Amino acid sequence: MIGLQMRQCWTQDTEAGIQRMNDTQLRDEVMTIFLAGHETTANALTWTLYLLSQNPTVEDKMYEELCSVLGNNGDSGKDDSIPSSSNSSSIDNKRIPTVKDVPKLEYTEKVLRESMRLYPPAWTMGRHAINDYKVGKYIITASSVILISQYVMHHNPRYFSDPDRFYPDRWTKEAKSQLPRFSYFPFGGGIRGCVGEPFAWMEGVLLIATVCQQWKMHHDDTHNKVELKPLITLRPKNGMRMKLERRK
């Protein structure tokens, strides 16, 4: 992505409406990519690990999938071309997940998807109205700034039954196909949607699989109560202190 933007600094096609990107624009775009891809992913993983610690049945089901795909003291899912972890003899037959494993980690993806429904890192976004619109009894004039909250929409019982429940199994293919457009949009949507969405899904699934195949999560209940702190991203107000138990 950065390479494409750097080439844009030297490319100009007046007839096609392509203008050169100056150094300031390139710097701003690079900063956007780094900032948008850092804190959002960190918060998504934080909330996911917390939810797993509070829902042991879900955690166990996901771990069963990880063992099936990545191996667990046996040959299941083992790929001899990929070196196994050597951190402990008890996990020697578990290999590190790769991009090729992502399509097989269906339940892990559901866990991440449900986590970002309950706690979307990008919890609200703004849009400028380009024309006058009437929405119900409300008139939105051109150039108005409209705030759209993923958090509010993702907790709407019209679209998600029992919306405050962490329930990854709700994300069946049929259920996803029946959801109205933009009822679930953790990465925004339309032409201004997050350009890094495909990478973020891949990264999130692989990170969760890598961590949870080795460790079991326990939330430190002696720490402060878990509260929301909605800033640019949705983060836990007092941080998230976890205890890690190595799996055997």
PLM feature spans:
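A residue-level signal for conserved active-site and pocket-lining positions in enzyme catalytic cores
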Residues: 5, 115, 242
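Cytochrome P450 catalytic core segment centered on helix I
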Residues: 1-16, 88
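Cytochrome P450 heme-iron axial ligand motif
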Residues: 31-42, 50, 138, 172, ...
